[in-house]
Amino acid sequence: MTISSFLRVRHSLAAAKCVLENAKQSFSSHAAFAEHAKLERIRNIGISAHIDSGKTTLTERILFYTGRIKQMHEVKGKDNVGATMDSMELERQRGITIQSAATYTMWKDHNINIIDTPGHVDFTVEVERALRVLDGAILVLCSVGGVQSQTLTVNRQMKRYNVPCLAFINKLDRTGANPYRVLGQMRSKLNHNAAFIQLPIGVESNCKGIVDLVKQRALYFEDHLGLTVREDEIPQEMRAESDERRHELIEHLSNVDESIGELFLEEKTPTEQDIMAAIRRSALKRTFTPVLVGTALKNKGVQPLLDAVLNYLPHPGEVENIALIEKKGKEPQQIMLDPARDGKSPFVGLAFKLEAGRFGQLTYLRCYQGVLRKGDSIFNVRSGKKVRLARLVRLHSNNMEDVNEVYAGDIFALFGVDCASGDTFVTNPDLELSMESIFVPDPVVSMAIKPANNKDRDNFSKAVARFTKEDPTFRFAYDTDIKETLVSGMGELHLEIYAQRMEREYNCPVILGKPKVAFRETLVAPCEFDFLHKKQSGGQGQYARVTGVLEPLPPHQNTTIEFTDETVGTNVPKQFVPGIEKGFRQMAEKGLLSGHKLSGIKFRLQDGAHHIVDSSELAFMLAAQGAIKSVFENGSWQILEPIMMVEVTAPEEFQGTVIGQLNKRHGIITGTEGSEGWFTVYAEVPLNDMFGYAGELRSSTQGKGEFSMEYSRYSPCKPDVQEKLMQDYQIAQGNVVVDAKKQQKKKN
């Protein structure tokens, strides 16, 4: 290298460093800009993916390149610091993101709010909450692992909340990287109309840069931090492939976009602007998914991804947000919220996450309409409580920055607000409107829990009270039959994390029992009931009669219970119907076969009778309970168990062993695939048969096998499992085992 070229390189590095320092120093002015940014210059995005796909590393790079942090850190805390977005000590140790950290940053005069979500399936509720309040998302896929179980879950969640997304195929530098295979999986498994808008220039150790198919240029990321992005001609050896992939991109767009479709049919070549506009239109409608590539760890492809967020993901004004106006005695009416950032419409916000911070309860909100200023009073629509706001803060991981006001489209946090996740807040209590609530899945695993030392009971109570309020999938109950305290959640890891947090944050070590599956009891066939509750013991008596049908719901509704009032006339006065429903729901809390909840049943109240003096709501509640007991005696019942979707990846030589293990655990193989010495098997396995599988898989694959699982559905359990559950329950109740067999009715 000549002296002049060396000086040029040193000068460019110094310039890049200077630019970065200026970005850091001017971020206070960025915060002021963020408060008053135009609607078109705001993006609310989430970063979602399967565990260990590189989401948190990608977020760390985004924060660095936008000047939000001064230096990058590794995720698993190898540098004793850990990633910025992993603020909890437990997260830094495990190298997984447990809570959705929120932050905001600036890129090319646009304010970007980012939620970094967990990838582990046990923390699915965090992903649900994040997607509910976002306008767009980046779906991160590993170029080796491809589409995995949690990717399918995240994809379903994005579909539920209609969130447009970009796909970013990460980890091009890893051995076995194959972005083309991942694109094929996106089309076949996720049913995405997806195409590359970038191509990698080499993979694994030869990963040099990327080709931008829209601009038809090669991009190289220079110096060891990748700060300088150099444009160049597409390498000669890649031009044929680039032309072919660009044509494929136009073809996929022409299937969903009219303008490009016309140009395609007329065999005209669309311009760069035509393609960008078509990608944006179709991405917003969720009819096309642009696919980008890169490696966050090696600092390649992050800046073009940020450009794509601005170019192809929606601003708050392009997303339809609906609220419900609810008047007593009338059907809820849907209205569109006004996304304008002018403060002319009244404030409407949604609480999507609760957290116990250092200064009290922290409530994360999204402002959907209007403006909220420090010192304003807001009302909780559900509870009617009024709160005056002393502080408004923006979040950067676990750091807070005070702001004076927030506008429609902003994500922010409040202190000292007593509410639940999914509550709607307004400044005008006469509005009587609420946002749709956040979907919360039911827990599938329970464990007995108790403090290791009796002296820690107070801290234990505080921890449980806080965690159950923060996380609606973490449940706490006392079982009077077995005299044990139970916690329930989305998996073993979910409950273990909370146990460790109790010890770490509340100095309260706990003892966890063996995992227990949340079985359910349901009817096999409809069963009629006609029950009279009559009691006379001096003074006013009790008289109530209920008749109707208890029937099973369709399989896709077998985790819910329903009550319908089909009575005509005044045989059952309307003021007593709520008592009947209450009696039914109380009985549904505990079945007679195994002591588990009833689900997948519908109580149809068809007729009854009352007494002018002796009837009361209590009498009808007891009559409903008696009716359910009669159906227990006369109906045909079965026990349901949760079925999990399991994905196992291991070296090919262990394929037979792994499939044998899954068959032994009563699994049904639904698919297999393999590439470059590794295979992946997909199966549906009862959760009750999955305990202890992690250790078995490790020992049988020399520690190389990995698996993940997520809840799929409830299905009838095998006869021998049902028999054992019934016997165990009867023994626990102190009844004769033979009586349990009498409880099991023949299936119709």
UniProtKB/Swiss-Prot annotation:
Q: Where does GTP bind?
A: 49-56, 116-120, 170-173
Show the GO cellular component annotation of the record: mitochondrion
The lineage's top-level taxon is Eukaryota
Q: Which GO terms describe its biological process?
A: mitochondrial translational elongation
Q: Where is the transit peptide?
A: 1-14
Q: In which pathway does it act?
A: Protein biosynthesis; polypeptide chain elongation
Q: Which CDD domains match?
A: EF-G, EFG_III, EFG_mtEFG1_IV, mtEFG1_C, mtEFG1_II_like
**What keywords is this UniProt entry annotated with?**
Elongation factor, GTP-binding, Mitochondrion, Nucleotide-binding, Protein biosynthesis, Transit peptide
UniProt KW Protein biosynthesis keyword: yes
* Protein purpose: Mitochondrial GTPase that catalyzes the GTP-dependent ribosomal translocation step during translation elongation. During this step, the ribosome changes from the pre-translocational (PRE) to the post-translocational (POST) state as the newly formed A-site-bound peptidyl-tRNA and P-site-bound deacylated tRNA move to the P and E sites, respectively. Catalyzes the coordinated movement of the two tRNA molecules, the mRNA and conformational changes in the ribosome.
Q: Which family does it belong to?
A: Belongs to the TRAFAC class translation factor GTPase superfamily. Classic translation factor GTPase family. EF-G/EF-2 subfamily.
Q: What is this protein called?
A: Elongation factor G, mitochondrial
